[in-house]
Amino acid sequence: MQLINISDTVHKLILNDQEIILIGTAHVSQNSVEEVKNIIETESPDRVCIELDDGRMKSKTEKKSYENMDIRKVIKEGKGFFLLANTALASFQRRMGAQTGTKPGEEILGAAEVAKNAGIPVSLCDRDIQTTFKRAWAKSSLWNKCKLLATLISAAFSNEEITAEELEQLKSQDTLQTLMQEMAKELPMVKEVLIDERDQYLGRSIFEAPGKKKVAVIGAGHTQGVISTIESLSEGKQTPTLDNLTIVPKGKPIGKVFSYLIPMLIVL
């Protein structure tokens, strides 16, 4: 693999049978929004890959209100983690947007819109957020499960302003990655699930997406991990498959109790 660093945020990966232009964006920067649009229009790729999963894409584009959500359906479908994680992210993003004037993740949706207008197929390359939390949950002890819930609930309902120092740091990361890192500090035993696996999943999804020339838009915090994964795949090294990274181990009965409590905590 040949790696060409076009800038601090744009990297070209030249492989045997494909070319990947990787854009590591700052999710709270207007410059990132314009950069993504310009690169897609200039490069005219045959595929655009973005750092979203199907559930988060729908939550961003359909603008569903939690107030109108059928909580019984959420419980029945076992989507408590998804609801709590999205509540935490939405809260965090609102606080960031209020202080920066830019809606976090706008460049990701912008990439999808530019691609759609140009007739370019889009691949959603991130792992389902619920799968990530369920895998982390399965690796946690009862005490760590409580800490995981506490971290998510705290993020979901916090009104604390982000400091200037924290804001500068966030400009080089994406909000979900920041949330994952925060939980990894509290739960080092599941760092592999929260951080490393997600980089591997993104890297493999981008590598395996159809197309000879692809533009991939991801948070800057993922860049090195994704490049490393793609390099390993291009060299034929053994790396986890997407199926391996989405298997959710069967949980203990106590886990089901928590999954019922999560949506109840949100609406109470």
Could you say what each language-model-derived stretch is?
Residues 1-268:
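Compositional signal for N-terminal targeting/processing segments
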